[in-house]
C-alpha cells in the first residue's frame, strides 16, 4: 500500500512504515553471515557482529562496542533489513526469541503498537494517547481484508464482522494479558467499532420510545463505565485494573445490524472489598461516592467525604492522579440512566455500597471473663442496618450470637471477636459480589431487545497468566482458565494451519497440538484431581489445609509429571505444591483454601437479609438457602440447596466449561496485550519483562506452532513474477506456461534443498529460512544484472555521445561547403533575380491556402452547430436516463433486500426440509425395522407356543436329568474350588515376587551404594596421590598456585567487600527506617500530649458540671423523698405483677408441656385465668391510683421539676457529648498505644536485626582482616620467593652461560618455536584445568595448610640448594672480578687464560650439553615416566577390571532377577487368562452339554411317542378291521404323522448341513491362523539368520581391526626398542657430563614429571569415571530395550491370545467340530516339536554368537589396553617436547645474556688483538653448526612423535567403534535370548492348550459316540416304524382292492 493510499487512514505513521523507510531498509548493507543476536544478562539479547569462530565458540562484537565469546548454539542470525518492523512476525525468515523481541521493540519505538504474529495480534501498551482510534480510522478499516490494511484492533474486529456475515458463523475475540497491558482499553475499542459500524448501517431506524434510555449502541458503550466503577480498582501496575473477567456477546441480525448484547463475568476479586495493599485501593465506586460531587448521596448514605473515616476503603491509597473521581461519579450515574436503571434501583445500589463502608467501622470487644464478643458502640451498626433495611439490634445479635442447627434443634452460639470480624468481612464480600452480579443481570436485561438476532461476536477480556511470589487459590483458578484457553488457542491455530495444507493438497500427517496441555488440565479438573480433592475435603467437617495437602501428595506426587514438591527458599513465602503450567512452574500456598472454597456465611444474618425492607437486598439473597432449610424441602427446595452450597471451585469450573463451550461454537480471533515496562513510561521497553510475557501469553508458542509446517507461502503468479530472475531460462518468454508448472520448473532448476518446499493447488509453501535464502540469491542476481546494465548503459551513452560528435563534425563540413558555394554565387545576376522572385511565388500559395481555410472554417462551424444541438438533446436524454437509473437502482436495492431475506428464508426452509426429510427417512427406516421385528417376534411367538406345548410334555423327562446335572454341578464346583485354590497359590507367588522385587531393589540400591563407595575410594586415593606428589612440586608450580590462591583471595575479598557494602547499605536503610519511625513516634507522642491536654480541659469542665449536677441532685433528692412512698407502693404492685406474670408463664409452660389434655387442667386453667383477671384489675386500679397521686405531686412541683429537668437534660447532653469524645479519644489513644507497641516491637526487631547484622559485619571484618593478613603473608612470601627465584634463575643462567655461550640459531628455530608454543599453550591449558580442579577439591582448610607446609619445606630445600649455588657463583664472580682488577697490568696473560678456559669449557660443553639437552634428559624422563605410568596403568586397569567385573556381576544378577520377575509375571498373566478361558469354556461346554441333553430328550420323547403309537396301532390291528371307517381315519392320521416325520427329518438334515458349513468355515479360519503363525515363524527365522550374518560380519571386521592394531603395536614396540638402544648408547657417552651440568635442573624436571604424572592419573581417574558412567548408561539402555522388548512380546502374546480365544469360541460352538480340534491338536504337537527343534538350534547359534562376542570383547579390551599404553607413550613424548621447549627458552635467554657479556668482553679486550677474536668467532660458528644439527635431530623426533600420535588417535577411534559394535552385539544377543524364552513360553502354552483341548476332545468324543449310538437306535426304530407303516399301507391297499 502506497503512502497516498495510507493517507486515508489519517494516522498513517503510527500504523505502517513509509515508502522511504522501506526503500532505505532494502538498500541498507547487510551481511547475513556476520549479523547476529547474542544473549545478554540485562537486555536478554543484543545485536552483534561475528568476528571469529573457533572450536564451537563464537567471538562477536556487540552494537555497543563490547566483545563477547559465546557458544555457537547461543548465537542467532538476524533477519535481512527488508524484514525490519515487519507487520506479521510469522513471515520472518529466522524466527526465534530475539527476532520477535526486536521486531516488537522497533515497532514500539516507532509507535506502531499493533503487530500480527501468525493468526493473532500482539499489542503493546503505549502509555499515551495515539490518534489511531478516531472516526477516520474506523471508516478506513471498514470492509478491508487483513492483508489490505496495517495491523490494528479494528482490523481484527472488521475481519470478525465480515467472517460472521460471509461464513454465517459466530465469532469471538479473545483479549488476554497481564494487568495493565491494555485489555480493557482494547475491549472498549472493539465495542466502539461494532457500535460505530452498526450505527452506520442502521441510523435511519433508531427510534426508541424511551428517550432517557438512549439507543442500543449507547447502552452497549455505557455498560463499560457502570461495570468499571464497581469492578475496576487501582493496583500496583495499573490505575484502572479490571478485577474481573468478562465475555461480552454482541448479537447481530441476519443483515449485520446490531440486535442486542449480553455480558458474562468471571472471578470477581471479592477480597479487595475488605482488604487492599498499601499501593492499591478499593473499587472506584467508593471513592466516587466520597468525592462530594453529589452531596445528596452523602446525606442519603450517612457518610462523610473523608475516605480515612472508613476502614474498608482506606487501607491503601485513596486517590489516583490519573482518575477524577467526581467526574467518574457523574459518568457512572449517567450510565445508570442510559442503561434504564430506575431511581429505586440506583438508590438501592448506592445504599448497599454505603452500608459496606459502615460495616468496616463496626467495633466489637470481648466480654469480661468470657471469650464471647459484644458490640463496642452501635452507631455504625445502626447506620448500616438503616441502609440495608434491617433492625440494628437483630443485626448485632445475629453477628454476636448466631443460631446454629444441632441435630433437629437450633442453638444460640457465642462468637469470639475474631469470628465476628471474619463474619462481617464474609458478609460484606458476599453483598458486594451479589450486587455486582445483579447489576450484570440488570444490564443484560436492558441490552436484551425483541429484535431478531442471528449471530453474535463475543469479546473475552480476562486476566492473563499469574506467577507471583505468593500464589493462592485465586491464582490457581486464573492459571487454570488460561491453561484451558491456551489449549483452545493451540488447537485452533494449528488446526487452521493444517486445514490450509489439506485444502492445498499437501501431503501432511495431521497432528493434534491441542492435547499438549491436557495432562495439566486433567490434573486440575478430572476426578481425583486438585479441584475434586478440594471439594471432597470441603465436605468433611474435620478437614484442614494439611489434610488437603496430604491427599494431594498421596494421589499425585510421583504419579503426575505436572505435580511437584516445591523447594522452599528462605525469605520467600512457603509453598506447599508446584504445578508445571505451559508458562512455567508455579508454587502454590494452600493456606485458607478450604474456607475460600466453602465461602461460609452467617446464616442468621442472611436470614435477616432475606427479610430486609430494602427491595434490592431481599432480591439479592432470595435464592440463598441454608443447609438446614434444604434438608426438609423437596423438589425445588432440593435444587436450591445444591445451588447455594456449590463450592467456589465447582462454580468456576461450571462457568469455565460454559465459556469453553461458547468459544468452541465460534471462530476465534486472538489478541495478546503486552506491558512494555513497570514504570508506565511511554516508548520504553523492558526486554526481560516483555520476554516473560511473550512466554506466558503463548506468543512464542503460537509462532512455533504456526512455523512447524510451512510458514512462508506465495501464490504461484507472485512467485513466478518475483523470482523468475533467478533462472529466466527455466520459464521461456515466448511460450505460455502455467504459473504452477513454471514455479515448479524454476525451483527445480535452483541449487537449493528440494525437501524444504511443497507445491499446493494455488501456492508454493516454504520451510523456515528458505525464503530468506531465495531473497539473498535474488539480491545477488540483481546486483550482477544491475552492474551489467550500468556497464552497458555507460557504453551506450558514450557511443551516443561519439555519434553526436561525428554528426556535428559532418554537419560542420556541409555548412562550410555550402557557405563557400554561396560566397561563390551570391554576386551572380541570375541568383539576384531568383532572390527577388522567390517571395512572390510564396504569396500566391498563401492566398490559395487562406481560401481553403475559410471553406474549411465554414464547414466546421456548421458541424459544430449540429453537434451542439445534438449534445443538448443527448444531455436531456441523459438526465432522464439518470433519473430512471436511480429509480431502478432503488428498486434493485429493495429487490435485493427482499431477495436476501427470501434467500435466508429459503435456506432456512431448505435446511428444515432436509432435516425433516432425514427425520422422515429415519422414521420410515425405524418403521420398517419395527415391522420386521414385529414379524420376527410373531414368528418367534408361534414357534415358542409350539415349543411350549412340547415342553409341557417334556417336564417329566427333564426331572430325570436333574440328578445328572446336579452331579455335574458338584464336579464343576470341585473344579472351581481347585481353581480358587490355584488362584490363592498364585496370589502367594505374587506376594513372594513382590518381596523378591523389593529385595532386588534393595540389592540394586546396595550395589549403587557400593559403586559410590568405590568411587569415593578412588577419589580419596587420587587426593592422597595428589597430596604426595605435591610434596615434591617445583617452584614454578607453587608460584602459580599461590597466584591462584591470591586471585581467589582477592575475589573473596571483593565479594566480602561487596557483601559488606550491601550489609552497610541495608544497615543504613534500617537506620533511616528507624529514624523515620522515631520521628513518627515523636509526632504521635506530641499528638498524644495534645490529646491529653484536651482531655484534662474536658475533665475540668466535667468537674464543674458535676458540681452543678450535685447541687441539682440535692434538690432532686428532696423531691424524690416525697415520691419514695409512691415508689414503694408501685414497687409492691410491680413485684406482685411480676410474680403473677411469672406464675402465668409457668402455668402456660406447663400447659404447653401437658398439652391441656385433661378436663381438670382446663378447669384449673380457668380458675387461674379468673384469678389472673382479678389481679390484673387490682393492678390496673392500683396503677390508676398511683398515677393520680403522681400527677398531683407532679402538678405540685411542676415548675421546679421543669427547671431542674431542663438543666439535667442540658447536663446529660453535655455529659453524653463528653463521654462520646472521651470514648473516641480513648479509642484513638488505644490505637496510638497499639501503634506505639507495634513501633516499639518493630524497633526492637530492627535493633535485633541490626545487632545481628553488626555481628555479621564484625565477623566479616574479622574474616576480612584474617584474609587480608593471609593475603599479605602470601604477598610477602611471593615477593620473597620471586626474589629468590630471580636470583636462582640468574645464577642458573650464569651457570648455563658458561655452557651455551655464543649460540645463534634464531632463524632456523622459528618454525619449531611456533609448533612448540602451540603445544605449550595446550599443556598450559591442561595445567590450568588441573590447577582449577585441585583448587575446587581443596574444600578442607587443614588439607590446604598441610599442603602449604609441605610446599614450603620443598621450597626451603630448593632455597638451600640455590643459596649454596649462589654462594659458589658469588665466590667465582668475586674471584673473577678481583683477579680482573688486580691483574689489569697482566691483561694479555689474563686474556689468554680466559680464552684457554673458554675453549676448555666449550669443548666440555660440546661433549656434554649437545647430547645432554637433546637425548639424555629424554631417556631418563621416558624411563621414569614409563615405570611410574606402567604402575599407575596396572593399578587403574586392575581397579577398572574389578569395577567392570562387579558391574557385570551386578548386571547378571539384575538380568536374572528381571528375567525371574518377567517369567513369573508372564506365568501369572497366562494362568489368569487360562483360568478365565477355562471358565468360559466350562460355561460353553455346559451350555453345549445342556443342548445335547435337550436334543437327547427330544429324541427320547419322539421315540416314546412313536412306540406308544406303534403299540396303539398293534392293539388296533389285533382287534381286527372292525370298522373300515375307523381304519380310514387311522390311515389319514398315519399319513399326517408321516408327513410330520418327513419334515422333521428334513429339518434335521438342514441343521446338519448348517453345522457342517460352520465346521468348514472354522477349518478355513484355523488354516489361515496356522498359515499366519508359520509365516511369522519364517520371518523370525530370517531375522535370526540376518542377525547371525551381521554378527559374523562385525566379528570379521573386529578381527581385521585387531590384527591391524596388533601389527601397529608390534611396529611401535620395535621403534621403542630401537629408541631405547639409542638412548643406552647416549647414556654411556653422556653420563659423566650429566652429573656435572644438570645438578640444579633435576629438581625442576622431577617436579614437572610429577605434575604430568598427576595430570595423567587424574585423566585416568576421569576416564575411569566416564567409563563407569557409560557402563551405567549402557545398563539403563539395556533395561529400556528389555522393557520395550517385553512390551512387544506382551502385545504379541495378547494378540495371539485374542486369536486363540476366537478360534476356541468357534471351536466350541457345536459338538460336531470336536473332530477338527483333534486335527488341530495333532498339528500343534507337530509344530511344538518343530519349534523345540528350532529353539534348540537357535540356542546353539545364540551360544556360539555369545562366545564369539566374548572373544571379540576380550580382543577389544586388549586393543584398548594397547591403545592406552600408546597414548601414555605419546603423552611422554609430548612432555619431552615441552621440556625441550623450556630448555630452548632458557638457552635463548642465556644466549642473550652471553651475547651481552661477550660485547662487554669485546670492549674490554679491544686491545687484545684480532687473533683471539677470530678464534672466538670460529668457535661460535662451530657451535652454531652443532646447534643446527641438534635442531634437525629434534625436528625429526617431533615428526616421529606426531606420527605416533596420529596412529594412537586412529587406534583409539577404532577401539571406540569396536566397543560400540560389541554393545550392539550384546544387545542383539539379549534380544535373541528374550525371543527364545518367549518362543519357549509360547510352545509350552500351546502344549498346555493342546493337552486341555485333547482332554475336552476326548470327553466330547465320548459324549458324541453316546449320542450317535442313541441316534442309531432312534433311526433303526424310525426305519422299523416306516416299514410297519408301509406294511400297513400295503395291507390297507389290498383291503381296499378287495
Swiss-Prot record:
Leader sequence residues: none
Biased composition (Basic and acidic residues): 1924-1938
Chain ranges of the IQ domain: 782-811
CDD domains associated with the record: MYSc_class_II
GO cellular component terms, semicolon-separated: cytoplasm; muscle myosin complex; myofibril; myosin complex; myosin filament; myosin II complex; stress fiber; Z disc
Domain of life: Eukaryota
In-chain residues carrying the UniProt-annotated modification N6,N6,N6-trimethyllysine: 128
Additional comment: The cardiac alpha isoform is a 'fast' ATPase myosin, while the beta isoform is a 'slow' ATPase.
The protein's name in its UniProt record: Myosin-6
Species, as recorded: Rattus norvegicus
Lineage: Eukaryota, Metazoa, Chordata, Craniata, Vertebrata
Amino acid at each position: 500500500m502506497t503512502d497516498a493510499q495510507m493517507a486515508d487512514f489519517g494516522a498513517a505513521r503510527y500504523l505502517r512504515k513509509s515508502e522511504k523507510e522501506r526503500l532505505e531498509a532494502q538498500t541498507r548493507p547487510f551481511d547475513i553471515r556476520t549479523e547476529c543476536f547474542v544473549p545478554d544478562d540485562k537486555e536478554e539479547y543484543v545485536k552483534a557482529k561475528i568476528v571469529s569462530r573457533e572450536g564451537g565458540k563464537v567471538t562477536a562484537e556487540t552494537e555497543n562496542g563490547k566483545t563477547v565469546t559465546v557458544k555457537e548454539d547461543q548465537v542467532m542470525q538476524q533477519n535481512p533489513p527488508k524484514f525490519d518492523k515487519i507487520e506479521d512476525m510469522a513471515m520472518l525468515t529466522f524466527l526465534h526469541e530475539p527476532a520477535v523481541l526486536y521486531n516488537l521493540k522497533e515497532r514500539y519505538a516507532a509507535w506502531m503498537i499493533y503487530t500480527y504474529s501468525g493468526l493473532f495480534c500482539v499489542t503493546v501498551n503505549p502509555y499515551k494517547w495515539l490518534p489511531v482510534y478516531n472516526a477516520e480510522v474506523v471508516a478506513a478499516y471498514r470492509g478491508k481484508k487483513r492483508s489490505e490494511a496495517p495491523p490494528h484492533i479494528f482490523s481484527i474486529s472488521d475481519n470478525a464482522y465480515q467472517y460472521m456475515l460471509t461464513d454465517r458463523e459466530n465469532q469471538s475475540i479473545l483479549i488476554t494479558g497481564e494487568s495493565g497491558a491494555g485489555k480493557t482499553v482494547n475491549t472498549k475499542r472493539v465495542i466502539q467499532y461494532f457500535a460505530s459500524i452498526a450505527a452506520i448501517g442502521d441510523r435511519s431506524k433508531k427510534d426508541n420510545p424511551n428517550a432517557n434510555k438512549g439507543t442500543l449502541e449507547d447502552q452497549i458503550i455505557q455498560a463499560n463505565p457502570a461495570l468499571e466503577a464497581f469492578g475496576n480498582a487501582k493496583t500496583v501496575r495499573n490505575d484502572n485494573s479490571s478485577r474481573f473477567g468478562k465475555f461480552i456477546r454482541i448479537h447481530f441480525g441476519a443483515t449485520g445490524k446490531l440486535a442486542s448484547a449480553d455480558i458474562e463475568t468471571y472471578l470477581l476479586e471479592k477480597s479487595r472489598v475488605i482488604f487492599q495493599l498499601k499501593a492499591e485501593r478499593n473499587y472506584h465506586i467508593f471513592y466516587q461516592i466520597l468525592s462530594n460531587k453529589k452531596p445528596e448521596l452523602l446525606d442519603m448514605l450517612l457518610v462523610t467525604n473523608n475516605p480515612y473515616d472508613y476502614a474498608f476503603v482506606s487501607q491503601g491509597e485513596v486517590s489516583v492522579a490519573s482518575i477524577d473521581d467526581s467526574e467518574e461519579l457523574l459518568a457512572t450515574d449517567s450510565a445508570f440512566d442510559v442503561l434504564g436503571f430506575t431511581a429505586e434501583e440506583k438508590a438501592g445500589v448506592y445504599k448497599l455500597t454505603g452500608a459496606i463502608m459502615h460495616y468496616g467501622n463496626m467495633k466489637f470487644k470481648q466480654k469480661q471473663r468470657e471469650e464471647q464478643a459484644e458490640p463496642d458502640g452501635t452507631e455504625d451498626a445502626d447506620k448500616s442496618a438503616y441502609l440495608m433495611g434491617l433492625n440494628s439490634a437483630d443485626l448485632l445479635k445475629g453477628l454476636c450470637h448466631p443460631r446454629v442447627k444441632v441435630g433437629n434443634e437450633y442453638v444460640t452460639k457465642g462468637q469470639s471477636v475474631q469470628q465476628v470480624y471474619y463474619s462481617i468481612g464474609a458478609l460484606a464480600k458476599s453483598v458486594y459480589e451479589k450486587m455486582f452480579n445483579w447489576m450484570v443481570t440488570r444490564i443484560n436485561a436492558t441490552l436484551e431487545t425483541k429484535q431478531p438476532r442471528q449471530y453474535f461476536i463475543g469479546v473475552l477480556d480476562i486476566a492473563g497468566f499469574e506467577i507471583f511470589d505468593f500464589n493462592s487459590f485465586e491464582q490457581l483458578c486464573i492459571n487454570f482458565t488460561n491453561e484451558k484457553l491456551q489449549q483452545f488457542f493451540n488447537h485452533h491455530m494449528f488446526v487452521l494451519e493444517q486445514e490450509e495444507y489439506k485444502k492445498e493438497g499437501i501431503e501432511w500427517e495431521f497432528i493434534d497440538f491441542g492435547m499438549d496441555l491436557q495432562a495439566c488440565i486433567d490434573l486440575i479438573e478430572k476426578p481425583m484431581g486438585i479441584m475434586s480433592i478440594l471439594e471432597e475435603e470441603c465436605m468433611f467437617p474435620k478437614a484442614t489445609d494439611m489434610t488437603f495437602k496430604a491427599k494431594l501428595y498421596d494421589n499425585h506426587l510421583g504419579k503426575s509429571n505436572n505435580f511437584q514438591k516445591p523447594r522452599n527458599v528462605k525469605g520467600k513465602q512457603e509453598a506447599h505444591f508446584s504445578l508445571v503450567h505451559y508458562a512455567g512452574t508455579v508454587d502454590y500456598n494452600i493456606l485458607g483454601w478450604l474456607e475460600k472454597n466453602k465461602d461460609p456465611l452467617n446464616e442468621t444474618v442472611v436470614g435477616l437479609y432475606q427479610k430486609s425492607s430494602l427491595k434490592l437486598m431481599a432480591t439479592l439473597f432470595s435464592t440463598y438457602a441454608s443447609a438446614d432449610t434444604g434438608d426438609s424441602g423437596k423438589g425445588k427446595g432440593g435444587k436450591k440447596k445444591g445451588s447455594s452450597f456449590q463450592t467456589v471451585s465447582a462454580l468456576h469450573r461450571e462457568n469455565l466449561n460454559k465459556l469453553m463451550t461458547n468459544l468452541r461454537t465460534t471462530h476465534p480471533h486472538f489478541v495478546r496485550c503486552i506491558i512494555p515496562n513497570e514504570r508506565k513510561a511511554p516508548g520504553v521497553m523492558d526486554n526481560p519483562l516483555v520476554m516473560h510475557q511473550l512466554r506466558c501469553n503463548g506468543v512464542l508458542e503460537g509462532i512455533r506452532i504456526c512455523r512447524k509446517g510451512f510458514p512462508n507461502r506465495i501464490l504461484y503468479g507472485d512467485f513466478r513474477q518475483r523470482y523468475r530472475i533467478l533462472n529466466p531460462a527455466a520459464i521461456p518468454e515466448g511460450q505460455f506456461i502455467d504459473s504452477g508448472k513454471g514455479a515448479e520448473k524454476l525451483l527445480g532448476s535452483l541449487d537449493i534443498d528440494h525437501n524444504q518446499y511443497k507445491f499446493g493447488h494455488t501456492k508454493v509453501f516454504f520451510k523456515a529460512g528458505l525464503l530468506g535464502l531465495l531473497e539473498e540469491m535474488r539480491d545477488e542476481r540483481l546486483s550482477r544484472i544491475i552492474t551489467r546494465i550500468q556497464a552497458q548503459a555507460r557504453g551506450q551513452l558514450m557511443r551516443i555521445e561519439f555519434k553526436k560528435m561525428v554528426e556535428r563534425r559532418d554537419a560542420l563540413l556541409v555548412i562550410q561547403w555550402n557557405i563557400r558555394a554561396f560566397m561563390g554565387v551570391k554576386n551572380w545576376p541570375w541568383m539576384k533575380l531568383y532572390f527577388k522572385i522567390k517571395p512572390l511565388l510564396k504569396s500566391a500559395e498563401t492566398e490559395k491556402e487562406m481560401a481553403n481555410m475559410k471553406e474549411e472554417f465554414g464547414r466546421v462551424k456548421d458541424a459544430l452547430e449540429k453537434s451542439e444541438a445534438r449534445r443538448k438533446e443527448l444531455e436531456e436524454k441523459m438526465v432522464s436516463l439518470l433519473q430512471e437509473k436511480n429509480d431502478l437502482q432503488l428498486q434493485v436495492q429493495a429487490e435485493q433486500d427482499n431477495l436476501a431475506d427470501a434467500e435466508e428464508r429459503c435456506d432456512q426452509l431448505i435446511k428444515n426440509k432436509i432435516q425433516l426429510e432425514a427425520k422422515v427417512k429415519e422414521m420410515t427406516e425405524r418403521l420398517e425395522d419395527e415391522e420386521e421385528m414385529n414379524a420376527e417376534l410373531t414368528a418367534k411367538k408361534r414357534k415358542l407356543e409350539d415349543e411350549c406345548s412340547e415342553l409341557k410334555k417334556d417336564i417329566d423327562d427333564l426331572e430325570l436329568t436333574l440328578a445328572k446335572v446336579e452331579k455335574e454341578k458338584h464336579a464343576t464346583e470341585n473344579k472351581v474350588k481347585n481353581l480358587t485354590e490355584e488362584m490363592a497359590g498364585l496370589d502367594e507367588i505374587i506376594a513372594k515376587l513382590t518381596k523378591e522385587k523389593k529385595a532386588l531393589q534393595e540389592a540394586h540400591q546396595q550395589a549403587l551404594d557400593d559403586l559410590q563407595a568405590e568411587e569415593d575410594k578412588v577419589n580419596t586415593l587420587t587426593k592422597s596421590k595428589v597430596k604426595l606428589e605435591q610434596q615434591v612440586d617445583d617452584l614454578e608450580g607453587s608460584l602459580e598456585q599461590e597466584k591462584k590462591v591470591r586471585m581467589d583471595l582477592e575475589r573473596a575479598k571483593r565479594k566480602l567487600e561487596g557483601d559488606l557494602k550491601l550489609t552497610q547499605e541495608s544497615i543504613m536503610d534500617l537506620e533511616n527506617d528507624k529514624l523515620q519511625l522515631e520521628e513518627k513516634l515523636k509526632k504521635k507522642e506530641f499528638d498524644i500530649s495534645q490529646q491529653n491536654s484536651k482531655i484534662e480541659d474536658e475533665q475540668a469542665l466535667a468537674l464543674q458540671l458535676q458540681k452543678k449536677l450535685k447541687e441539682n441532685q440535692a434538690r432532686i433528692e428532696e423531691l424524690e423523698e416525697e415520691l419514695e412512698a409512691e415508689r414503694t407502693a408501685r414497687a409492691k404492685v410491680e413485684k406482685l405483677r411480676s410474680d403473677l406474670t411469672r406464675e402465668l408463664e409457668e402455668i402456660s409452660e406447663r400447659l404447653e408441656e401437658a398439652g391441656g389434655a385433661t378436663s381438670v387442667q382446663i378447669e384449673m386453667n380457668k380458675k387461674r385465668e379468673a384469678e389472673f383477671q382479678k389481679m390484673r384489675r387490682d393492678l390496673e386500679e392500683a396503677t390508676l391510683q398511683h398515677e393520680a397521686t403522681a400527677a398531683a405531686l407532679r402538678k405540685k412541683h411542676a415548675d421546679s421539676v421543669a427547671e431542674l429537668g431542663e438543666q439535667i437534660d442540658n447536663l446529660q447532653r453535655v455529659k453524653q457529648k463528653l463521654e462520646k469524645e472521651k470514648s473516641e479519644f480513648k479509642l484513638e489513644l488505644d490505637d496510638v498505644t497499639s501503634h506505639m507497641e507495634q513501633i516499639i516491637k518493630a524497633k526492637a526487631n530492627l535493633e535485633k536485626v541490626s545487632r545481628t547484622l553488626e555481628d555479621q559485619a564484625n565477623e566479616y571484618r574479622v574474616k576480612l582482616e584474617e584474609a587480608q593478613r593471609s593475603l599479605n603473608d602470601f604477598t610477602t612470601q611471593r615477593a620473597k620467593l620471586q626474589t629468590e627465584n630471580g636470583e636462582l634463575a640468574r645464577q642458573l643462567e650464569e651457570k648455563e652461560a658458561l655452557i651455551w655461550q655464543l649460540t645463534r640459531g634464531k632463524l632456523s628455530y622459528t618454525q619449531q618455536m611456533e609448533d612448540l608454543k602451540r603445544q605449550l599453550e595446550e599443556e598450559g591449558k591442561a595445567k590450568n584445568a588441573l590447577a582449577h580442579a585441585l583448587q575446587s577439591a581443596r574444600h578442607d582448610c587443614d588439607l590446604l595448610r598441610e599442603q602449604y607446609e609441605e610446599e614450603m619445606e620443598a621450597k626451603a630445600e630448593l632455597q638451600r640448594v640455590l643459596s649454596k649455588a649462589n654462594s659458589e657463583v658469588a665466590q667465582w664472580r668475586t674471584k673473577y672480578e678481583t683477579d680482573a682488577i688486580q691483574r689489569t697490568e697482566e691483561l694479555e696473560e689474563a686474556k689468554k687464560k680466559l680464552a684457554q678456559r673458554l675453549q676448555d669449557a666449550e669443548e666440555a660443553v660440546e661433549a656434554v650439553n649437545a647430547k645432554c639437552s637433546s637425548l639424555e634428559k629424554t631417556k631418563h624422563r621416558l624411563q621414569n615416566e614409563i615405570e611410574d605410568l606402567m604402575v599407575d596403568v596396572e593399578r587403574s586397569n586392575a581397579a577398572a577390571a574389578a569395577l567392570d567385573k562387579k558391574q557385570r556381576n551386578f548386571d547378571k544378577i539384575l538380568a536374572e532377577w528381571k528375567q525371574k520377575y518377567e517369567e513369573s509375571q508372564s506365568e501369572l498373566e497366562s494362568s489368569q487368562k487360562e483360568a478365565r478361558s477355562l471358565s468360559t469354556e466350562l460355561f460353553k461346554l455346559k451350555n453345549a452339554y445342556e443342548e445335547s441333553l435337550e436334543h437327547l430328550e427330544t429324541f427320547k420323547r419322539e421315540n416314546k411317542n412313536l412306540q406308544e403309537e406303534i403299540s396303539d396301532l398293534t392293539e388296533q390291528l389285533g382287534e381286527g378291521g372292525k370298522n373300515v371307517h375307523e381304519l380310514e381315519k387311522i390311515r389319514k392320521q398315519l399319513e399326517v404323522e408321516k408327513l410330520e416325520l418327513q419334515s422333521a427329518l428334513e429339518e434335521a438334515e438342514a441343521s446338519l448341513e448348517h453345522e457342517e458349513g460352520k465346521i468348514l468355515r472354522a477349518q478355513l479360519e484355523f488354516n489361515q491362523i496356522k498359515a499366519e503363525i508359520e509365516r511369522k515363524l519364517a520371518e523370525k527365522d530370517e531375522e535370526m539368520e540376518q542377525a547371525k550374518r551381521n554378527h559374523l560380519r562385525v566379528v570379521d571386521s573386529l578381527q581385521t581391526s585387531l590384527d591391524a592394531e596388533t601389527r601397529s603395536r608390534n611396529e611401535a614396540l620395535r621403534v621403542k626398542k630401537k629408541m631405547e638402544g639409542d638412548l643406552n648408547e647416549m647414556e654411556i657417552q653422556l653420563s659423566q657430563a650429566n652429573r656435572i651440568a644438570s645438578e640444579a635442573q633435576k629438581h625442576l624436571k622431577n617436579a614437572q614429571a610429577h605434575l604430568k604424572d598427576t595430570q595423567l592419573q587424574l585423566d585416568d581417574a576421569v576416564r575411569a569415571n566416564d567409563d563407569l558412567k557409560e557402563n551405567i548408561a549402557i545398563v539403563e539402555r539395556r533395561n529400556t530395550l528389555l522393557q520395550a522388548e517385553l512390551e512387544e512380546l506382551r502385545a504379541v502374546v495378547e494378540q495371539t491370545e485374542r486369536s486363540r480365544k476366537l478360534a476356541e469360541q468357534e471351536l466350541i460352538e457345536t459338538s460336531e467340530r470336536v473332530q477338527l480340534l483333534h486335527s488341530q491338536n495333532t498339528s500343534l504337537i507337530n509344530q511344538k516339536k518343530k519349534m523345540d527343534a528350532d529353539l534348540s538350534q537357535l540356542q546353539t547359534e545364540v551360544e556360539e554368537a555369545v562366545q564369539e562376542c566374548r572373544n571379540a570383547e576380550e580382543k577389544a579390551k586388549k586393543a584398548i589396553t594397547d591403545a592406552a599404553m600408546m597414548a601414555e607413550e605419546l603423552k611422554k613424548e609430548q612432555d619431552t617436547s615441552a621440556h625441550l621447549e623450556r630448555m630452548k627458552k632458557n638457552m635463548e635467554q642465556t644466549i642473550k645474556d652471553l651475547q651481552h657479556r661477550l660485547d662487554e668482553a669485546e670492549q674490554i679486550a679491544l686491545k687484545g688483538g684480532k687473533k683471539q677474536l677470530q678464534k672466538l668467532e670460529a668457535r661460535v660458528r662451530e657451535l652454531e653448526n652443532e646447534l643446527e644439527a641438534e635442531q634437525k635431530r629434534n625436528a625429526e623426533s617431533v615428526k616421529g612423535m606426531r606420527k605416533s600420535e596420529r596412529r594412537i588417535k586412529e587406534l583409539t577411534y577404532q577401539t571406540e567403534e569396536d566397543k560400540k559394535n560389541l554393545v550392539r552385539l550384546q544387545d542383539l544377543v539379549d534380544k535373541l535370548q528374550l525371543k527364545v524364552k518367549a518362543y519357549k513360553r509360547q510352545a509350552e502354552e500351546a502344549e498346555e492348550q493342546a493337552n486341555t483341548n485333547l482332554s475336552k476332545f476326548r470327553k466330547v468324543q465320548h459324549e458324541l459316540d453316546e449320542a450317535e449310538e442313541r441316534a442309531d437306535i432312534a433311526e433303526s426304530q424310525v426305519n422299523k416304524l416306516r416299514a410297519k407303516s408301509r406294511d400297513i399301507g400295503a395291507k390297507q391297499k389290498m383291503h381296499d382292492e378287495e
